[in-house]
Amino acid sequence: IRDVERSRGLGDVYKRQELGIKQIKEFFQLNLSSELRLRRVTAPLFVLKGMGINDDLNGVERAVTFPIKDLGDAKAEVVHSLAKWKRLTLAEYHIEPGYGIYTDMNAIRADEELGNLHSLYVDQWDWERVITAEDRNVEFLKEIVTRIYAAMVRTEYMVYEMYPQIKPCLPQKLHFIHAEELRQLYPDLEPKCREHAICKKYGAVFIIGIGCKLSDGKKHDGRAPDYDDYTSKGLNDLPGLNGDLLLWDHILQRSIELSSMGIRVDKEALLRQLKEEGEEERLELYFHKRLMNDTLPLSIGGGIGQSRLCMFYLRKAHIGEIQASIWPEDMRKECKEHNIHLI
């Protein structure tokens, strides 16, 4: 953890900090809902194992699992995120194109590498919206991302109105770039360092094509093959209809990822991506059968980190200043030495 120059807008007064967190969350989700025409729904904390509903994220993270006594010890998994569950829910609620849902998602990611931005506990707004086949293009993706970013800019101004010491720093315009273009721009840097470099330059960036193979044969970052479409043609005929939204954090002096989102796979993209990853056996799972049988709507969706968003607006150096979680003792000690008080 860096010994950083931190804003004292809220000082160490927990009462004002908790009020700030509450107001940010209420204001932002109201703006998100109205921007994208989303209805709030209640989401599960866990789902049955073996249904293909839980998300695999990068494909290697272990889900927290437990047996259910009344179901003959059938296994349940605490969710990683709700990408596939939301799409099933859109079908169940018969949501029309142009409308969608959002939810408060709480998850446990036991394999997370803990640090300033990463916790065992994940809280985010998970959202999903029904689209048409004509919407499955990069221009529509950019339109939706721009609307989400507009809600972020408005929220930052609300924080400034509440706490004038916290000056707005977000640029009015979001910069779009494909992961391949980013690689060519900074060929000698690793993917995370490319993110830091481009974010420092523009302040707010959306990187398209997360999960697709770049010209060097590597991926910018991993994605599970069965929710985001990262292989269909997108920006400048490069593959990918998904991406990550990143902001430059002036406190940590690095980029932070606030949202991961994308146009979801249709049948063709699902088959293509499962084959590419050698995971065609997933087609036997419940979610995948529903998709292949045309009983799920086309959709776009993503997640927006609640704690990270609050951390950014309130100029905090560690996510543990926003949320309660478990941290290594040496991390707590180091934070305390730098006047960073973890909840």
What are these regions (language model features)?
Residues 108, 179-343:
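A translation/RNA-centric and nucleic-acid-associated enzymatic feature enriched
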Residues 15-90:
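N-terminal "assembly arms/tails" that initiate or stabilize quaternary assembly
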Residues 82-124:
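Conserved alpha/beta core surface patches that mediate binding of polyanionic ligands
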Residues 27-35, 147, 151, 312:
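Generic, well-ordered alpha-helical scaffold segments in large soluble proteins
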Residues 1-14:
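Single conserved hydrophobic/aromatic residue that forms the stacking wall/gate
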Residues 140-159:
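Compact, glycine/acidic-enriched structural inserts
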Residues 126-137:
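A generic structural motif
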Residues 153-191:
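Alpha-helical scaffold segments that mediate packing/assembly in large oligomeric complexes
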